Amino acid sequence: MTSNALYELFRRRLPRAPVNTVMFLTRRTRDGFCGRLTSIATNSHYTMFVLDHGSVRIERPSQSEVDCASLMETLKRIRLRNSWVASEDELDVSRRDA
């Protein structure tokens, strides 16, 4: 299946409307988990990012692969920053019994 056909399939089948990228990333950075990127599809005008098997859909103008890579890096940073593993690393658990 070509990416254009995949994009059209996602656009028709996913129940929710696309979310605003800036609002989504701002909210997720502040509130926590952003979900896993499960699919990417593109046509000649837009790139669609599907998170958590369709629970969130982000559409952005198709400009370049650099934009796709930067969005994916941002999603990774949010996920790492808000995971319990990352927050455990930030805790100061050293003993201060002196």
Swiss-Prot record:
> Could you tell me which Pfam families the record lists for this protein?
DUF5500
The source's superkingdom equals Viruses
InterPro entries hit by this protein: DUF5500 (IPR020504)
Family, according to the entry, reads as follows:
Belongs to the HHV-5 UL19 protein family.
The protein, known as: Uncharacterized protein UL19
Origin organism of this chain?
Human cytomegalovirus (strain Merlin)
- Name of the gene this protein is made from: UL19
